[in-house]
Amino acid sequence: IFTIATIAVPVLTLNIMDAVMRFNLDKGVNHDEITKIGIVILLAAIIIGAVLIPISNGISSLSDLSLFIYFYCISSATSQIFLCDLRGKELLVQYSIGNILNTLLIAAFNIVFLLFFKWGIRGYLLAYSFANFIVSLYAFVVGKVYHSFFSKINKSKMNEMIKYSVVLIPNSFMWWIMNSSDHLMVTSMVGVAANGIYAISYKLPTLISTFTGIFNQAWSY
C-alpha cells in the first residue's frame, strides 16, 4: 500500500513541491505568489483524490483502506509542499526541525496506535497521516503560508512551474523503482508476511539515512 501511495503523490500533485522549492530560490521572487500556486495544485489534488475513492473501493484489496490511503496521500503531499516551501525560502533551520519532528511523530504515533491500540495497518497509515498533518501545520505557521492567501494567481508563472515539475515525474518513478519496487517483488514471490518482515528490517538504515539526508538537503543550496 505504501509502495503504491508513494508514487501516487507526485502524480496527483504534478510533483509541484519541486517547483515550489526551485522557484522560491530565485532572487527577488514573490514568495507568496509561488506558495499560492503550490496550494492551488494541492487543492486540485485533494479533489481528484476524493473522486478516485469510489474507484479504489472497487478494488478488493483496497476497499477497506481507501479513506486511510487517501488521507495518507493528502497529508504526505501537504507536508512535502510546505516543507519545500520552507527550503525554497531558505528557512533551513525550520526545514530541518520540520523533518526531525516528522520522524519523531511517526515513531510516537506508531507506538501508540500499533502497540497500545492494536490498530494494525490502519494505525500505521494514521500514524503517518497525523504526523504529516502536524508537520504541515508547523511549516504553515513558521513559513507564514497564510500570507499567500491574499496574493493573486499568476497564470503564466503557474504554467512555468507546472512545465518544470511535470518533467520531473519520471524521475520520481525511477526513484520509486529503485527504492520501493522490491517490496512488490517480495510480496508476489513469498507473500505479505515476508514483505512485512523485510519492510521492518529496512526501517533502521532508513531512519539513519533520513537523519543524514535532512541536513545534507537543508544545506545543499
Label the predicted regions.
Residues I1, D26-L42, I46-I74, F116-L125:
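Membrane-interface helix-capping segments at transmembrane helix termini in multi-pass transporters
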Residues I1, G58-L67, E90-I97, L104-L137, ...:
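Membrane-interface helix-loop junctions in multi-pass transport and translocation proteins
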Residues I1-V9, I121, K157-Y164, L168, ...:
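Interfacial/gating helices of multi-pass transporter permease domains
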Residues T6-G28, T206-Y221:
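Helix-loop junctions and terminal segments of transmembrane helices
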Residues I7-V11, L43, I47, V51, ...:
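Alpha-helical transmembrane segments of multi-pass membrane proteins
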Residues K27, G88-K89, F116-K118, S180, ...:
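Helix-loop interface residues and adjacent transmembrane-helix termini in multi-pass membrane transporters
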Residues L67, V93, I97, I121-A127, ...:
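Interhelical loop/hinge segments that connect adjacent transmembrane helices in multipass membrane
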